[in-house]
């Protein structure tokens, strides 16, 4: 049986990326959060610092909803502008919950953790948009199915 979302149900976007973002990268993530909130998306992220904190700040500026899935059981370590927090107490394993929660995943900057989240997203069939992050090419040199590169948040 296939689940069907009710008409008008919110769409979810998972935003992943650098936990230590440069000011430029944080500005892009904040702008992305603003744009997603303006369009009515619920934003899911890892709930901590860097890109996660910046995207939540952008969402809050525009009155949107953000959900942070934390790696630990301590809600006090969450980014301050999140609407809701989920304490997973799962460490890096929470990355699967972050990417599985979105209808699409947007990667902004990042290092090895972000690369692992991109792989997890594709393994569960989520489309991925790459914004100032890893350049990924399959062994045959072609395009990766379900992965697109973007130059700006717009």
Predicted features along the sequence, with ranges:
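Acidic/glycine-enriched connector segments
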Residues: 5-7, 27, 34, 49-124, ...
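Residues at the starts of beta-strands that form the adenosine-phosphate
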Residues: 12, 42, 65, 127
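Glycine-/small-residue-rich active-site loops that bind phosphorylated ligands and cofactors
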Residues: 20-21, 43, 113
């Amino acid at each position: 049986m296939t689940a069907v979302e009710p008409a008008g149900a919110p769409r979810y976007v998972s935003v992943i990326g650098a936990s230590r973002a440069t000011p430029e990268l944080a500005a892009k993530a904040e702008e992305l959060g603003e744009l997603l909130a303006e369009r009515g998306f619920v934003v899911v992220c890892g709930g901590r610092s860097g890109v996660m904190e910046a995207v939540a700040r952008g969402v809050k500026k525009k009155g949107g909803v953000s959900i942070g899935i934390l790696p630990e059981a301590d809600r006090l370590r969450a980014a301050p502008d999140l609407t809701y927090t989920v304490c997973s107490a799962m460490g890096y394993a929470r990355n699967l919950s972050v990417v599985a929660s979105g209808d699409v995943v947007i990667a902004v900057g990042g290092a090895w953790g972000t690369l692992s989240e991109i792989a997890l997203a594709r393994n569960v069939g989520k489309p991925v948009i790459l914004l100032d992050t890893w350049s990924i090419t399959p062994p045959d040199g072609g395009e990766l199915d379900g992965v697109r590169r973007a130059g700006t948040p717009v």
